[in-house]
Amino acid sequence: MRVTNRSLKGREGEIAVTAETLDDLWHLKYIIEKGDMVFALTRRKADSASDKLRPEKVEKVKVRLGIRVEELEFHKFANRLRIHGPIEHGMDTGSYHTLNVEIGTNISIIKEHWKNDQLQRIQDAEEAGKRPKVVIVAVEEGDADIGFVRHYGIEVYSHIRQSSGKRETGLRNEFFREIVEQLRHAVPEDASIVIAGPGFTKEDFLKYFNETESEMASKALTEDTSMIGMSGFQEVLRRGAVDRIMQESRIARESSLMEDLIREISMDGKAAYGFADVKNALGYGAVETLLIADETLREGREKGEDIDKLLMEVEQAQGKVVVFSTAFEPGEKLHKLGGIAALLRFKVTG
């Protein structure tokens, strides 16, 4: 994400950004909220007297509109964020319009009060653009999966299969060649690659990779996993391979924190989950790290709950706040625990 303008007076004002990746569109879903004013260039029908006589001739013109946000929808597979609401600035004031925000779109977001997590998201998205991207190749004999590590989770790019019963050297090399060919088309120049899987197939593939695409292969490392597919991708994250490449990776951090939380809960230790228990622990000054699901945060704000007051109290008590993605496994687990939990400085009873 690229910030093109920042004009804040205290916590009020405008920040203009350009979405550079699909991850940025996902971030914007949780930065923009109902009631915000959003400006962007868009296309809208320009009616005239002659147009009404010949409706088939009505053309859309490019205009800059400001809409008051009522609804947001992130369409991952269409690579766009749809922002819907009434027009307050520009042509056809009072009419409803939908802004389709795509990669490369510049938008201005105006808020009466920017919240800490929203400003942090923008900072994280800016920094993420400067960090290496990570691609995971999970491979075993005759089967391979390629996945991209995104902020919202793992995006499965492709599955490659070699027909069973055909493991001759020539056919095996053809299988490896297909994997390399897909990586050539899909992987950015600055990306790092984790080659994972059970057995020795991954080492054999890395050798072939080095022989055929040495520059790209120089950014690859191997990691043992018990399986391939999505479970293999998650295993790579748990084992820390992605963390070694992207030490600030949101996904790796959330996986680690969730493991800590589950371990503490299983031992009846320094953990709290559910709004009531977390608030009780906060009253004792025990909250060291607050874990909250992005959907819980968004829904709480829409319902007018005191969710931001809780976050502020955690920060005032020198605690940390981590917002989890519910599109990723740790966030799903957190959501099932009530959407909010905390790792504590000390155990709280009662």
Swiss-Prot record:
Enzyme superclass (EC): hydrolase
Superkingdom of the organism of origin: Archaea
Name the record gives this protein: Protein pelota homolog
Similarity comment text for this entry: Belongs to the eukaryotic release factor 1 family. Pelota subfamily.
HAMAP family: PelO
Organism expressing this protein natively: Methanosarcina mazei (strain ATCC BAA-159 / DSM 3647 / Goe1 / Go1 / JCM 11833 / OCM 88)
UniProt entry tagged with the keyword Metal-binding: yes
Function statement: May function in recognizing stalled ribosomes, interact with stem-loop structures in stalled mRNA molecules, and effect endonucleolytic cleavage of the mRNA. May play a role in the release non-functional ribosomes and degradation of damaged mRNAs. Has endoribonuclease activity.
